[in-house]
Regions:
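Small/aliphatic-rich secondary-structure junction motif
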Residues: 3-49, 71
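Short, hinge-like loop/turn segments at secondary-structure boundaries
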Residues: 50-54, 98-100, 122-123
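Intrinsically disordered or low-complexity boundary/linker segments at protein termini
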Residues: 1-17, 128-142
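A short acidic, glycine-rich active-site loop
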Residues: 52-63
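General small-molecule cofactor/ligand-binding pocket signal
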Residues: 36, 80-84, 135
């Protein structure tokens, strides 16, 4: 059913909610997993235009993606990584389309009101601008 699952990661504790769900689903369905993080700091947003060197944040993000990929591979799953640069919702949608993903998986913070305006916009934009199914798992508040 879901041949390739895109997992949008934040490099934050919220990822702990989505990773086990996707791993279990991928095992049961024989799905491939694409782990995606979108770096959206100043360097990331201007990286190509200004031919900038990779920032420490971007290096940390690459290492984080690989660490999570190793966890998936240790369970016998096929996992690849992608560090995208720019606006998170746009890059998630672009990667899901270009990589022919059949499911987008994300963690939700469960914000309300102002928090939705600030933090919930990525999920809102992704789920309202794709025909690909979106799996949301609520992250525990810590």
């Amino acid at each position: 059913m879901y041949k390739k699952i895109l997992v949008a990661l934040e490099n934050s504790p919220a990822d702990e909610a989505i990773v086990p769900h996707v791993a279990e689903m991928a095992k049961r369905l024989g799905s491939e997993v694409l782990l995606l993080h979108v770096a959206d700091g100043w360097v990331a947003r201007n990286f190509n235009q200004l031919k900038l060197a990779e920032s420490e944040e971007m290096k940390t993000d690459r290492a984080y993606l690989e660490k999570i990929a190793v966890q998936f591979r240790a369970q016998g799953l096929t996992a690849s990584t992608l560090l995208a640069l720019g606006d998170p919702p746009k890059e998630i949608l672009k990667a899901a389309e270009s990589e022919k993903c059949s499911l987008i998986a994300m963690s939700s913070h469960g914000h309300r009101l102002l928090g939705d305006l600030i933090f919930g916009s990525t999920i809102h934009e992704v789920r309202h601008n794709t025909s690909i199914p979106v799996l949301l798992v609520r992250a525990e508040k810590k």
